[in-house]
Swiss-Prot record:
Protein name, entry field: Undecaprenyl-diphosphatase
UniProt catalytic activity: di-trans,octa-cis-undecaprenyl diphosphate + H2O = di-trans,octa-cis-undecaprenyl phosphate + phosphate + H(+)
EC number of this enzyme: 3.6.1.27
Keywords (A to Z) from UniProt: Antibiotic resistance, Cell membrane, Cell shape, Cell wall biogenesis/degradation, Hydrolase, Membrane, Peptidoglycan synthesis, Transmembrane, Transmembrane helix
Principal subcellular localisation of the protein: membrane
Similarity comment text for this entry: Belongs to the UppP family.
Enzyme superclass (EC): hydrolase
Note: Bacitracin is thought to be involved in the inhibition of peptidoglycan synthesis by sequestering undecaprenyl diphosphate, thereby reducing the pool of lipid carrier available.
Domain of life of the native organism: Bacteria
Amino acid sequence: MFDIIKAVIIGIVEGLTEFLPISSTGHIDLVNHVIKLSQSQDFISMFEYVIQFGAILAVVLLYFNKLNPFSKPTAKARNATWQLWAKVIIAVLPSAVVGLPLNSWMDEHLHTPIVVATTLIVYGILFIILENYLKNKSAHITTLADITYQTALLIGLFQVLSIVPGTSRSGATILGALLIGTSRYVATEFSFFLAIPTMVGVLIIKIGKYLWQGNGFSGEQWAVLMTGSIVSFLVAIVAIKWLLKFVQTHDFKPFGWYRIALGAIVLLVMFI
């Protein structure tokens, strides 16, 4: 029963932070140091990523018509959707090439509070610096159709940075997209779309690794997984809608300050 309650809390954290540029993995790592599940470390490591499935479904639900080429009434519209998917896949490739070989090493060495705190602060500072730099500049990529294949690849290269816990997958891609000249709204949406193949790939790897190690799932573990995923799905829907409204009238500096504050608090707790 206590693990179900913990799964609800972790699911809320996942749903709130997955698409905000503040690092869901970093937050979940920190939460796990406070309310760790009463399960094996193998299960906990896998659980942290599997509950992202709920967040993926939230994007699929909210953008189903936009991302479904077969729902389009004309050949031109269908072709545009297929092109969008091609750009998303191109953007995902760098993370796949770099992340796959380093997956096990990162699990063993980088999921620590000091790594999370450091990356939270560093990228928080970068967001503030970038937003100040862009203050009087206009974006030249203002629609998803304006994103070229080359631009998609560049954004994907920035996503590689997110393999370090605390960086934030959405934060890295949004930061890169803004630097390239993408509007905040388009950068945010494209980040959502990149999450689908990226997180599905990570999900497959983590479950595969868990099973390869000879592990299985008990009834309680299935309940914990389902609870965390459902909660993250429901909360992510709210978070996505809120973020899309927020970026239409605000910049990302509040997230930068939040990252710096949280990272500083973690470091203070560690060393005091």
